[in-house]
Amino acid sequence: MSNVQTGAERMPHDLSHLGFLAGQIGRLITISTTPVIAGDSFEMDAVGALRLSPLRRGLAIDSTVDIFTFYVPHRHVYGERWIKFMKDGVNATPLPTVNTTSYIDHAAFLGTINPDTNKIPKHLFQGYLNIYNNYFKAPWMPDRTEANPNELNEDDARYGFRCCHLKNIWTAPLPPETELSRRMTTSTTSIDIMGLQAAYANLHTDQERDYFMQRYRDVISSFGGKTSYDADNRPLLVMRSNFWASGYDVDGTDQTSLGQFSGRVQQTYKHSVPRFFVPEHGTMFTLALVRFPPTATKEIQYLNAKGALTYTDIAGDPALYGNLPPREISMKDVFRSGDSSKKFKIAEGQWYRYAPSYVSPVYHLLEGFPFIQEPPSGDLQERVLIRHHDYDHCFQSVQLLQWNSQVKFNVTVYRNLPTTRDSIMTS
């Protein structure tokens, strides 16, 4: 009778580990990855402290921190190749890799040290791309489709991809292809009332898809249905934690002059993932994103910047605001010294749905506060995405980048795996 071991009892495995992390404002960085096997049950309690690098001045604005855990099946990355790989077993062709550069930190955005081979598994890189494309870019932005990490610029490879500002009138515009008008042609001088209604219906369904249903799952939900994350190879968001990182001012930071002070930010946090059943092999990604609210020194309330106001501008007439097409405005309409050639589109009356922050002019010549000093420039995508260099002047030192965190990931995975003793004592 054969004594070859062909199975194993389902047992808890302690995969707890530490993370010593550093990142930049507005960039999505991976802070932990755990490979998982079909049939696993994964649970995690992450406990840590997040710090901003020492500020040059007193703490002016709290930063908001988001921590996410996603599940990405390998099948979403490798497709039919993964299915064949599992069917072929030990005779299967090895899975492909992707190429990195030779720098040690050019895979840091994936939460790993770059190996000497300058190659990493494809599912790490493509899994990150899938997460970013589905959850962190504006739907109207093109997908990131780089085939290898060595195609990324240095900032993306080291610190992660740029994410959008928190929403306001100029950081969350309508899609650039938004129509400001639509004409209906008729063949005669008379108007077909039924045809007019049909044209309205076509316009409505087009607008719904342009604004609210750019992804398949959104279209299906509009019919009252629901798609699984498998339907469009979407990473599954398992848990999100959000908190504000607060701090305090420290007086007497200089030995010779106790009048100096510096802002310090240290916020403890907990990110808990309840037990999650893993249906097939994949990777659990945990990512972090730290952002300041977009507070600009030269931002102006739209009505204050426009000058002579029309009835439509100021009346707030529901009949008009509910039926007028979107309005195209420029950066000059919401910023002093804004570029009038940089256009974007907003819903009519959006200035009554949002209030800009105000920064006294006495701050304008001072560096060290987390304010956006100049109106964002570049194309629409460039203006919407956060530029971490805008905040470099806030910090005394960026040796540990703009924020850092020390965290204990308490991870337990229940899986069918032979014990270490069983693996040693072969046959």
Curated annotation (Swiss-Prot):
Extract the GO molecular function terms from the UniProt entry.
structural molecule activity
Sequence intervals crossing the membrane: none
UniProt GO BP: symbiont entry into host cell
Q: Chief localization class?
A: virion
Question: Which InterPro entries does the entry link to?
Answer: Capsid/spike_ssDNA_virus, Microviridae_protein_F, Microviridae_protein_F_sf
What is one term from the GO cellular component aspect held by the record?
T=1 icosahedral viral capsid
Where on the tree of life does the source sit, at the highest rank? Viruses
State the function annotated in the UniProt record.
Answer: Assembles to form an icosahedral capsid with a T=1 symmetry, about 30 nm in diameter, and consisting of 60 capsid proteins F. Upon virus binding to host cell, one of the spikes dissociates from the capsid and the virus interacts with LPS through the exposed EF loops on the F proteins. After the genome had been ejected, the channel formed by the F proteins at the unique fivefold axis remains open.
Q: Which family does it belong to?
A: Belongs to the microviridae F protein family.
Q: How is the quaternary structure described?
A: Pentamerizes and interacts with H protein, G and B pentamers to form 12S pre-assembly complex. By binding with protein D, induces joining of twelve 12S complex to form the procapsid. The procapsid has an external scaffold made of 240 copies of protein D, 60 copies of the internally located B protein, and contains 60 copies of each of the viral structural proteins F and G. Upon genome packaging, interacts with protein J. The mature virion is composed of 60 copies each of the F, G, and J proteins, and 12 copies of the H protein.
Q: What is this protein called?
A: Capsid protein F
Q: What is the source species?
A: Enterobacteria phage S13 (Bacteriophage S13)
Lineage of origin: Viruses, Monodnaviria, Sangervirae, Phixviricota, Malgrandaviricetes
